[in-house]
């Protein structure tokens, strides 16, 4: 069964600065079984971001965020704004 995670969040700096950090973390995410399908900003609000990931498991996604919390916060991702929804098919 395929598993996906949709993450919505606020960015407290420039989207493109956040995106540089996001790209830098991708090799680590892939090793954790997390593959980005999409990331972007809201058309009418560049401080609202979203990502869609294919994940091996929700537990691996949670562990990745816990391990990378400092880096995620440093990217401008406002941790307290994070909304995570899990899907499977």
Walk through the language-model features, giving the residues of each.
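Short S/T/G/P-rich N-terminal loop/turn motif that feeds into the first structured element of a domain
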Residues: 1-67, 80-89
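Short, exposed beta-strand-loop hairpins at the edges of beta-sheets
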Residues: 71-75
């Amino acid at each position: 069964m395929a598993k996906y995670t949709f993450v919505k969040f606020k960015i407290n700096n420039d989207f493109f600065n956040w995106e540089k950090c996001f790209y830098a973390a991708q090799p680590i995410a892939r090793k954790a079984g997390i593959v980005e399908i999409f990331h972007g900003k809201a058309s009418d609000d560049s401080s609202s971001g979203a990502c869609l990931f294919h994940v091996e498991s929700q537990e691996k996604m949670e562990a990745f965020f816990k391990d990378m919390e400092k880096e995620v916060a440093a990217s401008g991702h406002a941790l307290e704004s994070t909304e995570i929804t899990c899907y499977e098919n």
